[in-house]
Amino acid sequence: MIRATSLYAAIDLGSNSFHMLVVREVAGTLQTLARIKRKVRLAAGLYGDNRLSSDAMQRGWQCLRLFAEHLQDIPPTQVRVVATATLRLATNAAEFLGPASAILGCPVQVISGEEEARLIYQGVAHTTGGSDERLVVDIGGGSTELVVGRGAQALELFSLEMGCVTWLERYFNDRSLTRENFERAEQAAREKIRPVAFRLLAQGWQVCVGASGTVQALQEIMVAQGMDEHITLSKLLQLKQRAIHCGKLEELEIEGLTLERALVFPSGLAILLAVFAELGITTMTLAGGALREGMMYGMMALPVGGDIRQRTLENLQRRYQLDTEQAQRVTWLADGFARQVAEAWQLDERCFTLLRCASMIHEIGLSIDIKRAPQHAAYLVRHTDLPGFTPAQQKLIATLLQNQSNHINLTQLNEQNCLAPRIAQRLCRLMRLAIIFASRRRDDALPAVELRAAEETLYVILPQGWLSQHPLRAEYLEQESQWQSYVHWPLLLEETSQV
């Protein structure tokens, strides 16, 4: 039974949506118990004199009554509620905040744009893998946050008064998706960004991550259309052209775009295009968390330490009581194999990292049953929250685990959108071999294996006499050669006198 005192809640009263996150701490990370989101569109109820309409207030209070039921058994000291752009602007915000606090039974804090940006960055730093030198972009309903940081520290942060709801009302209020409306929206956004761009550019970054509903919508569109997870300027321009072709907001149809996100998608897209243009962004991926996660980690005083993905995988190993020594053997072999054929097979550091990640948890399916263990492993990875991994990376790892032995499903390997299909297939081949060679579960039983690749033909070169001295693994390798031949992957076994 989960004690209420072990629960924490973070509530974000945004300009477009209200969100609630309920978690508990497990092994130094967060286990999500509930996520509730309601479209309130508070910013749409802001009049020209910055007064919030009574209808918008009623929508907000109605949503908070739903949230309040979840909070009844959580100590108020373990609840944090913040309000952002719209309630910063509203001249009559106090009229909304008093009843809101009474409904929730705890205070509502209207945070500054800079504090919002800081919390967003903390949420990203705690949940997103990759380089520690990052630019974070969060397009909210009423504001857009831009932050450059290293590790857990935000170095430059800005909150700009533009968001997908306010830009919708200002530049698409006629609901027409014309080129002229897009150009006006983009130009206005660029004028907001330009005064701060030089300070962000001066810091520099290695990766760019997006932490907004607009970026989430783009991810959903790209997955639905079979594209990879990287958001690029060319993809944004294609989507803009598609929106213009649809003509009217009510007629906007893009494969993968949900009805819920469609209303503010064009305005968010216009802002994102401006961000790309002013900051010279080449590629962006989706962040693992943002404002609410930043609030939560701050409340629980959990440090940002080490590699987030490594911490996630080690937590999985503990949770499912995996044999970490065996995981290390397979990981070491798989990584070594990949580096031997890296040039011939065009494998880079990203490939090495993802292969190591899959190898570290390849036996996770055994925690359910040895029968269909690869399928169990894939299911667990697909349906577990993995901080530090993007949805596409998570899908790739699950696919590699599902294809770690016996039958090979080429369709699955080709449909993941993290790596090119051919590269995913090659990683699969290498991990399967690593598992076979490590099957004795002893360090002193690992042979000196040399791999060579010529296009798709893979040569496995072993010391002279090794196959006859190890008949079981020799049989596994012969079977593996057969499995790979079924999908037209030539695997040839050779022995050499050189050890």
UniProtKB/Swiss-Prot annotation:
<dbReference type="Pfam" id="PF21447">
    <property type="entry name" value="Ppx-GppA_III"/>
</dbReference>
<dbReference type="GO" id="GO:0015974">
    <property type="term" value="P:guanosine pentaphosphate catabolic process"/>
</dbReference>
<dbReference type="InterPro" id="IPR043129">
    <property type="entry name" value="ATPase_NBD"/>
</dbReference>
<dbReference type="GO" id="GO:0015970">
    <property type="term" value="P:guanosine tetraphosphate biosynthetic process"/>
</dbReference>
<dbReference type="GO" id="GO:0015949">
    <property type="term" value="P:nucleobase-containing small molecule interconversion"/>
</dbReference>
<dbReference type="InterPro" id="IPR003695">
    <property type="entry name" value="Ppx_GppA_N"/>
</dbReference>
<dbReference type="InterPro" id="IPR050273">
    <property type="entry name" value="GppA/Ppx_hydrolase"/>
</dbReference>
<dbReference type="InterPro" id="IPR023709">
    <property type="entry name" value="Guo-5TP_3DP_PyrP"/>
</dbReference>
<keyword id="KW-0378">Hydrolase</keyword>
<comment type="pathway">
    <text>Purine metabolism; ppGpp biosynthesis; ppGpp from GTP: step 2/2.</text>
</comment>
<dbReference type="InterPro" id="IPR048950">
    <property type="entry name" value="Ppx_GppA_C"/>
</dbReference>
<protein>
    <recommendedName>
        <fullName>Guanosine-5'-triphosphate,3'-diphosphate pyrophosphatase</fullName>
        <ecNumber>3.6.1.40</ecNumber>
    </recommendedName>
</protein>
<comment type="function">
    <text>Catalyzes the conversion of pppGpp to ppGpp. Guanosine pentaphosphate (pppGpp) is a cytoplasmic signaling molecule which together with ppGpp controls the 'stringent response', an adaptive process that allows bacteria to respond to amino acid starvation, resulting in the coordinated regulation of numerous cellular activities.</text>
</comment>
<dbReference type="Pfam" id="PF02541">
    <property type="entry name" value="Ppx-GppA"/>
</dbReference>
<dbReference type="InterPro" id="IPR030673">
    <property type="entry name" value="PyroPPase_GppA_Ppx"/>
</dbReference>
<dbReference type="GO" id="GO:0008894">
    <property type="term" value="F:guanosine-5'-triphosphate,3'-diphosphate diphosphatase activity"/>
</dbReference>
<comment type="similarity">
    <text>Belongs to the GppA/Ppx family. GppA subfamily.</text>
</comment>
